[in-house]
Design a protein with these regions (language model features):
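General small-molecule cofactor/ligand-binding pocket signal
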Residues: 37, 67, 110, 129-131
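Short, charged, intrinsically disordered terminal tails
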Residues: 56, 86, 119, 123-133
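Short, histidine-centered active-site or binding-site loop motifs used for metal coordination
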Residues: 8-9, 41-42, 81
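Short, well-structured N-terminal submotif of metal-dependent ribonuclease cores
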Residues: 1-38, 47-65, 125
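Amphipathic alpha-helical interface surfaces
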Residues: 19, 42, 53-57, 73-76, ...
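Active-site neighborhoods of divalent-metal-dependent phosphate/nucleic-acid chemistry enzymes
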Residues: 66-114, 118-119
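Short, function-defining helix-loop hinge/capping sites that tune catalysis or transport
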Residues: 14-16, 102, 121
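A generic structural signal for short hydrophobic patches within well-formed alpha-helices
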Residues: 10-11, 43-46, 74, 117
Length: 133
């Protein structure tokens, strides 16, 4: 299984009190879902540019795998977004998260946009579990 975080997932895990966040990460590790994967484009939605305010996000991301977005992933994301019928209302970042997920074995996406992610993967043959952040 692979855990993939969008900006809502990163914010949810980074925003918890330190002890609670550590317990949650240990449980994810025990279930072989850690380290989580985060597409690099997601970082634009979680960073403020203020190193003090970004402290908890930086701490969390040091424990994650940050993945680059290549041309093929971007094309796959665009296709998912178009096929959803909601390309005008679904963020490109969410489409990239969805495209990454459908390429993984047993993916789980932790997101604050479960409806958008569900629409993106609805017509795809891959099974993607979506969890609300």
């Amino acid at each position: 299984m692979t855990l993939i975080l969008d900006s809502g997932g990163v914010s949810a895990l980074a925003g918890q009190r330190a002890r609670l966040a550590e317990l949650r990460r240990r449980e994810l590790w025990r279930r072989e879902l850690w380290p989580a994967q985060v597409p690099a484009v997601v970082l634009t939605g979680v960073f403020t540019g203020d190193h003090w305010r970004d402290f908890h996000v930086n701490r969390l991301l040091r424990m994650c795998q940050i993945l680059g977005v290549d041309e093929q992933l971007a094309r796959n994301a665009a296709l998912l977004r178009t096929r959803s019928g909601r390309a005008a209302t679904i963020a490109a970042t969410d489409a990239i998260v969805a495209a990454l997920a459908v390429g993984q074995a047993d993916p789980i996406v932790l997101t604050s946009d479960p409806d958008d992610l569900a629409a993106l993967v609805a017509d795809h043959s891959a099974s993607v579990a979506i969890a609300r952040a």
